[in-house]
Amino acid sequence: MFNTGTPDSENTYDAILVGAGIMSSTLAVLLHELEPDLRLLVVEKLSSAGLESSCAKNNAGTGHAANCELNYTPIQEDGHLSTTKAFEINKSFEQSLEFWASLAEKGKLIPKTFLNKLPHISLVFGDEDISLLKKRFSKLSSHAAFAKMEFTMDHGELQDWIPLIMDGRKQSEKIAATRIKRGTDIDFGNLTRSYINQIEGAKSIDINYSTNVENLQQDSEGDWYLSLEGAKKNRIVRSKFVFLGAGGGALSLLQKSRIPEGLLYAGFPVSGKWLICDEEKSTKTHNAKVYGKAAVGAPPMSVPHLDTRWIDKKKSLLFGPFAGFSSNFLKYGSKLDLFRSIKTTNLFSMLQAGLDNIDLGKYLLNQLIQTNEDRIDTLKRFLPQVSPNDWKLSTAGQRVQIIKQTSKGGVLKMGTEVVTSSDGSLAALLGASPGASTAVTIMIEVLNRCWQEKMKSSKWKNKMLELFPSIGTDINSDQEALLAIRKRNDFLLKLI
């Protein structure tokens, strides 16, 4: 604990957002749009915004809409193919597009600085997986959200879709793909910085870089006090609301907050690696995000994909991800992060989750002992004619997988989760994929849980309707509304 003192008005805020990544910056823009006079403080450990998980090379850059990700349509134990998650994620991503479209309409976002239209393709090999892909295509394409999905097994058509991947393949090879042309590649680092650029000139907003949150505590009246350590000065700040959006660093801060809800969580860090190609002969030929199928027994995070990426306006190809291990919770964190996060309240959950996920342990071990030749061999499944010297290994960001204590014990969770205090004064975002693609929906959830009275007010309701014309409409069941909002989004974001 620390001596809070009594911060003056200069150090008192309506909301403090920890981390200047895609999550906190999304929430900051939402709050500023809803009520411009709110005093906001954004605190970032690094020297600029969007340098950790939001940085383009630290994530897949996929606008996750379930167009091509087979793990979003899992096969159930009874053999049934579930589409629930696919429709949920598709709807969430459309809401992100809707928000960006509204900001673009106001002249506050320039789509071409972070957003590129790019086909999303699912690719499989062999009879069994082709049968699975056919089933997925049949179920999804019957709905308006995926009505423009195409399926083919024809080598000639595939040559047109993915020429680099088809180069050197035998005509007899059994291969199939689906394609949705309305896919995207997103530079979330540039988007984050665009958000921050929108708000940093406002008198009501302070942004502190190179500043670390050392501790936080709540007083008897519900106010939060944060101890900040900066490059030039240290200070204590106060707020009635705190959002912990510090990526992998959110867990340790959640634990320091001592809210009971935070005691249910632990985390396990997994680092990522990409093979990157900048050779123009390849980057000119391949123009898609192509997702394969995870190997039997491998976790969803291991789904291999070959992506066209635009990073700082430069076109590259990325293949992966390959997993590694570091005890850091952040790429620029500490090797002690994992060990410091182990508490008496979560140790049993971690041990139980480990025993229940032996396959994940085997997968990570196999990944750790891989050589670069092994990685190139994996790439050859996608690119039979690959030139190994054209591909370089690059370290991506850290993801911290959630381990949550439930009635069934410690459970490893693969998605993202919002944790809030019972009084709504603190919220934290934990987890990984689909993450950034659904940041807008996640932050609206934070607003609904932590700013309930404001969200019920006519002022905020009207403002939300202005930002999200489809709000209150289930676009998964209302085809007319879906098509209308897509037409608007495509026009304003230049995705036509």
Curated annotation (Swiss-Prot):
Q: Which cofactor does it need?
A: FAD
Catalysis: reaction(s):
(S)-malate + a quinone = a quinol + oxaloacetate
The answer to whether the entry has keyword NADP is no
Keywords of the record, alphabetical order, are:
FAD, Flavoprotein, Oxidoreductase, Tricarboxylic acid cycle
Question: What residue ranges carry the coiled-coil annotation?
Answer: none
Q: Where are the transmembrane segments?
A: none
* Pathway terms, separated by semicolons: Carbohydrate metabolism; tricarboxylic acid cycle; oxaloacetate from (S)-malate (quinone route): step 1/1
One Gene Ontology biological process: tricarboxylic acid cycle
Question: Does this entry carry the keyword Repeat?
Answer: no
* EC numbers for this chain: 1.1.5.4
Q: Which InterPro entries match?
A: FAD/NAD-bd_sf, MQO
Q: Could you tell me one molecular function GO term of this UniProt entry?
A: 2-hydroxyglutarate dehydrogenase activity
Q: Which domain of life is it from?
A: Bacteria
UniProt record similarity statement? Belongs to the MQO family.
Read off the NCBIfam families from this record.
mal_quin_oxido, PRK05257.2-1, PRK05257.2-3, PRK05257.3-2, PRK13339.1
What PANTHER family does the database record attribute to this sequence? Answer: L-2-HYDROXYGLUTARATE DEHYDROGENASE, MITOCHONDRIAL
Name used for this protein in its record? Probable malate:quinone oxidoreductase
Q: Which organism is it from?
A: Prochlorococcus marinus (strain NATL2A)
The encoding gene: mqo
